[in-house]
From Swiss-Prot, chain A:
Family: Belongs to the G-protein coupled receptor Fz/Smo family.
Disulfide bridge positions per record: C45-C106, C53-C99, C90-C128, C117-C158, C121-C145
Listed name of the protein: Frizzled-5
Limits of the FZ domain: 40-161
The entry's keywords: Cell membrane, Cell projection, Developmental protein, Differentiation, Disulfide bond, G-protein coupled receptor, Golgi apparatus, Lipid-binding, Membrane, Receptor, Signal, Synapse, Transducer, Transmembrane, Transmembrane helix, Wnt signaling pathway
Signal peptide (UniProt feature, chain positions): 1-38
UniProt keyword Cell membrane, yes or no: yes
Disruption phenotype: During gastrulation, morphants display a reduction in the eye field within the anterior neural plate (ANP), while other ANP regions are essentially normal. Later on, at 3 dpf, they exhibit coloboma and microphthalmia phenotypes.
Naturally occurring in which organism (per UniProt): Danio rerio
Gene: fzd5
TM ranges: 249-269, 281-301, 328-348, 371-391, 415-435, 462-482, 513-533
UniProtKB/Swiss-Prot annotation, chain B:
Protein name according to UniProt: Protein Wnt-8a
Keyword Signal attributed: yes
Signal peptide: 1-25
GO biological process: anterior/posterior pattern specification; brain segmentation; canonical Wnt signaling pathway; cell fate commitment; cell migration involved in gastrulation; cell proliferation involved in pronephros development; central nervous system development; determination of dorsal identity
Encoding gene per record: wnt8a
Family of the protein in this entry: Belongs to the Wnt family.
Record flagged with keyword Oxidoreductase: no
Pfam families cross-referenced by the UniProt entry: wnt
Subcellular location: Secreted, Extracellular space, Extracellular matrix; Secreted
GO cellular component terms, A-Z: apoptotic body; cell surface; extracellular space
Length: 592, 359
């Protein structure tokens, strides 16, 4: 009912002035309707105006592109940043690839997207990505090749010149000019960035063992690849790092040699001065003298002559060898004397425990010295002979020495890590027991009067030295644990990935860990020298020189020196009747 | 017919506006009213049309497939139904109008509106800031409400339901806004991004409202208070009922009729003769079961028809740069709902069929 009334009202109202307005509205409505129809929002092809992308093979594009650029001016600002790369001709496909991404092709009769093929992207990336990485840029993620269709995909069409059935010349790149230079570059770069395939194979810098006559044939594998050897130098470290390694090892080994040589020489000219329980420090220093000598031999002979075999591209690290004399010599010096030094440290902690904890006198401890020497020299001998018999000596690609366990995890764990852990644990037990006893009997010692001050100081000095030894020893063990845990993955990465990817993912060994290991291996030898830093050393050398020159005429003074030395050993400063008394007192303690 | 119907509705809407004014002079109306309102008419018309097309797509494989009769929002014939499907029509139409107005606003088609720059330059998140041209949905919402709600001039519960569903459609456009970003940085890196809010595809809005259609709620009005008609009590009842419904949900008042059966008085054509999908790749479960839903459950059988189609195939790209396709003729099988024939003239045949049924 209401609507008929409205219609009636409408009819009445239109008569008069409003009639003109009504028809005017209708006219405007029709006009606007026409305008609306013409404004369609479909893809509109427009000529390419970006200067860099003119003449790439097609002339029309549409906006917005996949990067949400609204117009070609915006596209030009961004795509022009790649102009230096295009100019340098790192890849003949780069320009077409960039323009097909930024100014996508627009065809009137084909409305589906038509991106470049994945092969075009991969060719451009292979040629230009290494250059971008040199300047600190990575291949943009939003231009990753994985999102592009494959050539020949029927569902998603794509652009690549190889898909053309008829061979047509590409207008942007005439044949002679770009093909020469890019080929040369490709040849130069063919080895290192071999298009980053993830297939595992014996690729550079690994050394393939191809000849069956090669002594390592079917005997060596890297990253679980058979007949694949590691190169002479650690492939993860750069040339600068290798040079610094040589300097680093040279620095500490020379310092160690000088320090330990001084200590041993001082001991030799005045053997009576160093008695048990401190005497093992001297033997420990002697061991480090020979260890540093092993490193010095490597420095003089060179990395390649000690640790490597072969020539040119076929040069590789030594595996399971006993032949080369230099290699064996360096191995024996470093391994035998290194292990002996560890055992001497255990002996030191044991003798210190006897003296400080069990209140043994130096004479009683000295009575067992032949057993200490037997253990300290025999055990490393057996182990060294075992390593040589098992042909487990191999080259270290970092330090350039020969050792055990560089290429064999079993060798590393069995001959290096396990003994070090056992020695460290045993010595620490003795130290702990000794300190507990020391605190317990502290009051008893003090009751003896001022005579016990020197003894207590000596005990504390030896204990401090022995405890400080545990720091580098623990660090060496930690470095070895780190190395044996990650080495398989390092080797696998060498075989299964390319250098740029390894560098990006950081899947290599930590350079600092190795430098720390070599320093800690030698620092004990350096610090053992502080043991002889005292006025006594000067007196010993002065006496040695005086005794050497007038041998005949001073027999009585020698006797006097020995008497004085005894008094000094007894830890008393008084002469005359005091020495006799002290000697008398010590007899009962040794008896106990 | 559709544009004419909506066009007529719009014209009547504008005329009503003119008639409702009391102090308007012809000059004032021509200077302000026509320019301000006529500028949006084509967008409103195009938006409503896109809503209709989306409705047909969303209900292509339903028994009710958005027939023409449902699109006559205001008709002089018969009663306007307030079913679940009508609720969807109102929502998708309002969404279409708002969508088109907002998009045309961002495209610069209107002089008095532009991008939504309320957030320009502000920090949005880590590594990105607000910028660009955010779609001005508030403008589209305001103008769409002005035009679409003007079609409802009643004050009964039916009008209130329609207005509610109109608002739900507009809220669907806002709910589906998405953030789009553009990268800035040297050599294509994405060191910093500029982001803006952008309308989703209208298909996404249609799918969103289709879910709302499936979840629509039926209003249970107090029948006693409804008798009061257009009185104050009735309006109070309407207000009480609507306050309990979320603005984003669709509501309806009447149950849907049986869409299997033809009912020309209600503008329904039934499912006989409708096409359905039997098999094929990339079919959703709803599409795969369309034959059962449209034919078997409506007492009809599925009839196969072989149709030849011509299409482009084996497209290849030729360097550089053309795409050449072949023209292929394929025979495709399509399925339609057909009546089951029951011929009882031969007595023997009748017996035979009965026997089959027993077995």
């Amino acid at each position: 009912m209401r609507k008929p009334a409205d219609e009636h009202h409408f009819t009445m109202e239109t008569s008069g002035m409003h009639l003109v307005g009504f028809w005017l509205h209708v006219l405007l409505l029709f006009q606007l309707s026409g305008l609306g129809d013409s404004a369609s929002k479909d893809i509109v092809c427009e000529p390419i105006t970006v200067p860099m992308c003119k003449g790439i093979g097609y002339n029309h594009t549409y906006m917005p592109n996949q990067f949400n650029h609204d117009n070609q001016d915006e596209v030009g600002l961004e795509v022009h940043q790649f102009w230096p790369l295009v100019r340098i001709h790192c890849s003949p496909d780069l320009l077409f690839f960039l323009c097909s991404m930024y100014t996508p092709i627009c065809l009137q009769d084909y409305k589906k997207p038509l991106p470049p093929c994945r092969s075009v992207c991969e060719r451009a990336k292979r040629g230009c990505s290494p250059l971008m990485i040199q300047y600190g840029f990575e291949w943009p993620e939003r231009m990753s090749c994985e999102q592009l269709p494959m050539l020949g995909d029927t569902d998603r069409l794509c652009m690549d010149r190889n898909s053309s059935e008829t061979t047509t010349l590409s207008p942007p790149f005439p044949k002679p000019t770009p093909k020469g230079t890019p080929r040369h570059r490709a040849t130069a770069k063919s080895a290192p960035p071999q298009k980053c395939d993830r297939e595992c194979h014996c690729r550079g810098p690994l050394v393939p063992i191809k000849k069956e006559a090669h002594p390592l044939h079917n005997r060596v594998n890297t990253g679980s690849l058979p007949n694949c050897a590691l190169p002479c130098h650690q492939p993860y470290f750069s040339q600068d790092e290798r040079t610094f390694t040589t300097f680093w090892i040279g620095l500490w080994s020379v310092l160690c040699f000088v320090s330990t040589f001084t200590t041993v020489a001082t001991f030799l000219i005045d053997m009576e001065r160093f008695k048990y329980p401190e005497r093992p420090i001297i033997f420990l220093a002697a061991c480090y003298l020979f260890v540093s000598l092993g490193y010095i031999v490597r420095l003089l002979a060179g990395h390649e002559r000690v640790a490597c075999e072969g020539t040119g591209d076929q040069q590789h690290i030594l595996y399971d060898t006993t032949g080369p004399a230099l290699c064996t010599l360096v191995f024996l010096l470093i391994y035998f004397f290194g292990m002996a030094s560890s055992i001497w440290w255990v002996v030191l902690s044991f003798t210190w425990f006897l003296a400080a904890g069990m209140k043994w006198g130096n004479e009683a401890i000295a009575g067992y010295s032949q057993y200490f020497h037997l253990a300290a020299w025999l055990v490393p001998s057996v182990k060294s002979i075992a390593v040589l018999a098992l042909s487990s000596v191999d080259g270290d690609p970092v330090a350039g020495i020969c050792y055990v366990g560089n290429q064999s995890l079993e060798g590393l764990r069995g001959f290096v890590l396990a003994p070090l852990v056992v020695y460290l644990f045993t010595g620490s037990l003795f130290l702990l027991a000794g300190f507990v006893s020391l605190f317990r009997i502290r009051s008893v010692i003090k009751q003896g009067g001022t005579k016990t001050d020197k003894l207590e100081k000596l005990m504390i000095r030896i204990g401090l030295f022995t405890v400080l030894y545990t720091v580098p020893a623990t660090i060496v063990v930690a470095c070895l644990v780190y190395e044996q845990h990650y080495r398989p993955s390092w080797e696998r990465a060498l075989a299964c990935s390319c250098p740029s990817e390894r560098q990006r993912l950081g899947m290599g060994p930590d350079y600092a860990v190795f430098m720390l290991k070599y320093f800690m291996c030698l620092v004990v030898g350096i610090t053992s020298g502080v043991w002889i830093w005292s006025g006594k050393t000067l007196e010993s050398w002065r006496r040695f020189i005086a005794r050497y020159v007038p041998c005949r005429t001073r027999k009585p003074p020698v006797s006097a020196s020995s008497m004085y030395s005894e008094a000094s050993t007894a830890l008393t400063a008084r002469a005359g009747t005091a020495p006799t008394g002290t000697y008398h007192k010590s007899a009962p303690s040794s008896h106990v | 017919m559709n544009p004419c119907q909506i066009f007529a509705s719009l014209v009547m809407s504008i005329c009503c506006h003119i008639l409702s004014s009391t102090a308007w002079s012809v000059n004032n109306f021509l200077m302000t009213g026509p320019k301000a309102y006529l500028a949006y008419t084509s967008s409103v018309q195009a938006g409503a049309q896109s809503g209709i097309e989306e409705c047909k797509h969303q209900f292509a494989w339903d028994r009710w497939n958005c027939p023409e009769s449902a699109l006559q929002l205001s008709t002089h014939k018969g009663l306007r139904s307030a079913t679940r499907e009508t609720a969807f029509v109102h929502a998708i139409s309002a969404a279409g109008v708002m969508y088109t107005l907002t998009k045309n606003c961002s495209m610069g088609d209107f002089e008095n509106c532009g991008c939504d720059d309320s957030k320009i330059g502000k920090m949005g998140g880590r590594g990105w800031v607000w910028g660009g041209c955010s779609d001005n949905v508030n403008f589209g919402d305001r103008i769409a409400k002005l035009f679409v709600d003007a079609l409802e001039n009643g004050h009964d519960s039916r009008a209130a339901v329609n207005l509610h569903n109109n608002e739900a459609g507009r809220l669907a456009v806002k709910a589906t806004l998405k953030r789009t970003c553009k990268c800035h940085g040297l050599s294509g890196s994405c060191s910093i991004q500029t982001c803006w809010m952008q309308l989703a595809d209208f298909r996404d809005i249609g799918s969103y409202l289709k879910i709302k259609h499936d979840q629509a709620r039926k209003l249970e009005m107090d029948k006693i208070r409804m008798r009061a008609g257009n009185s104050a009590d009735n309006r109070g009842a309407i207000a009480d009922t609507f306050s309990a419904v979320a603005r984003t949900e669709l509501i309806f008042m009447e149950d849907s009729p049986d869409y299997c059966v033809k009912n020309l008085s209600m503008g329904l054509h039934g499912t006989e003769g409708r096409e359905c999908l039997q098999s094929g790749k990339n079919l959703s479960q709803w599409e795969r079961r369309s034959c059962r839903r449209l034919c078997h459950e409506c007492g009809l059988k599925v009839e196969e028809r072989r149709i030849e189609t011509v299409s482009s195939c084996n497209c290849k790209f030729h360097w550089c740069c053309t795409v050449k396709c072949e023209t292929c003729t394929q025979t495709v099988t399509r399925y339609f709902c057909a009546k089951r024939h029951r011929n009882r003239r031969p007595h023997n045949h009748s017996r035979k069929r009965q026997h089959t049924r027993r077995g």
